[in-house]
Regions:
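Active-site phosphate/pyrophosphate- and oxyanion-stabilizing loops and adjacent acidic/basic residues
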Residues: 216, 259-262, 297, 322, ...
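Small/aliphatic-rich secondary-structure junction motif
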Residues: 3, 12-37, 71-135, 162, ...
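Short secondary-structure boundary segments
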Residues: 33-34, 200, 276, 336-338, ...
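A short acidic, glycine-rich active-site loop
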Residues: 131-148
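Structural beta-alpha unit
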Residues: 4-5, 9-28, 51-55, 59-71, ...
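N-terminal membrane-insertion helices
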Residues: 143-154, 288, 292-296
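Intrinsically disordered or low-complexity boundary/linker segments at protein termini
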Residues: 36-92, 115-124, 164-168, 194-206, ...
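Charged helix-capping and loop-helix junction motifs
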Residues: 210-214, 289-293, 347-352
């Protein structure tokens, strides 16, 4: 039986509110050091929970706005969002999303956005569309073409489901007008998907034409869990990782991110290598090593399907990352991601960006 630990110390009213919030998510909560008959006699209340529920409790506390309306009937359950452009790399992403949906008894939502030709100054779908019918006719024609391509894309998925090539899940379709990255972010904010799965091209093609910038923009929003699926890989390889590289910030957000990883891919026996992110001077070298060691011990005790180890070096640049990849052969990278402002991104692009544009390894980016 898991021992109880103190999550927080609050006033009586706040402790009751937190207990209600946690119990609604299935967490057992005890209140200690308070006179429950007359709460005015107590200045503080310890909110205690089972130790194994700590990651979930931290996630709930850090994201109260996402859990407060959990009883809403309009809230979608276990939806996986797949932005598509009808290319092969977006089809690979859709196949991977079907497997995620099957594992978690959910559905997938295909999302395509098209640009108004009068605003974009170009034709996005095909060069054969005629805009001589006027602005209204052109928009109707463009939307009709978008829906036709979406229907064909969904039918291809259904055909492969029937043949047993990919799992059978419910497929929803959404077509909207707008800039792709803005449409994805707005849809995700409104529908809170469990995961966003995005296809990316090979590293060579991304470096050549900067394809993948839409994915980078979605990551910059920083509030969604995103799985990137590189073009050369198949779905099974992406969803059955054997060796995972986890970038650690050496704070409690690591526990949140590891718990998200385990909930998504915890049915596979995998090795997880914990590596230190480039950090500020708030940690000495010895303190950082102790913090990483404590994190490794905690994870080994609470996530039994995984075997945890620490990287022998701290990853500070792309060359160090490449050497580590050559040594271990990681097949999934997990990156806790903080939201960054535009200026800092321009001056010092984040590690997530560099991995997207410089490697062909699937990456799970988790907001913290």
């Amino acid at each position: 039986m898991s021992r109880f630990i103190t999550l927080a110390i609050h006033t009586y009213e706040k402790a009751l509110s937190l207990r209600t919030l946690l119990e609604n998510e299935g967490i057992n909560v005890e209140l200690h050091n308070v006179n429950l008959e007359d709460p005015r006699l107590s200045s503080g209340v310890r909110v205690r929970i089972p130790e194994h529920d700590l990651p979930l409790a931290l996630r709930i506390v850090e994201n109260r706005e996402l859990f407060a309306d959990n009883g809403s009937p309009d809230r979608p359950a276990h939806t996986v969002l797949v932005p598509v452009d009808f290319s092969e790399h977006s089809y690979n992403a859709a196949c991977a999303a079907c497997e995620v949906g099957r594992r978690h008894n959910g559905s997938i939502t295909l999302l395509y956005s098209y640009l108004d030709p009068y605003l974009a100054g170009k034709v996005q779908l095909t060069d054969t569309l005629s805009y001589e019918t006027g602005e209204r006719g052109a928009r109707q024609q463009l939307e009709g073409e978008a829906r036709r391509l979406m229907d064909n894309f969904a039918e291809r998925l259904r055909s492969h489901m029937k043949r047993g090539h990919i799992p059978i899940v419910k497929v929803n379709r959404e077509v909207a007008e707008g800039v792709p990255e803005d449409t994805i972010v707005d849809f995700a904010k409104a529908n809170t998907p469990r995961l966003i799965v995005m296809g990316t091209r090979s590293a060579e093609r991304k470096q050549a034409d900067m394809i993948g910038s839409v994915t980078a923009e979605v990551l910059d929003e920083g509030r969604f869990t995103v799985l990137t699926v590189p073009e050369p890989l198949d779905c099974e390889a992406v969803l059955s990782p054997r060796h995972i590289l986890f970038f650690s910030n050496l704070d409690q957000n690591d526990i949140l991110a590891i718990d998200t990883l385990y909930r998504l891919f915890g049915d596979n026996e995998s090795t997880v290598t914990l590596a230190q992110m480039p950090r500020k001077n708030r940690f000495s070298e010895s303190a950082a090593e102790k913090a990483l060691s404590r994190l490794t011990e905690y994870c080994a005790e609470n996530y039994k399907q995984y075997r945890f180890e620490t990287a022998p070096v701290r990853i500070t640049d792309d060359d160090e990352f490449s050497r580590l990849q050559d040594r271990y052969g990681f097949d999934l990278i997990v990156l806790p991601n903080r939201r960054r402002n535009a200026l800092s991104r321009l001056i010092n692009p984040g590690l997530a960006h560099r991995i997207i544009f410089g490697s062909d390894i699937p990456m799970l980016v988790i907001p913290v």
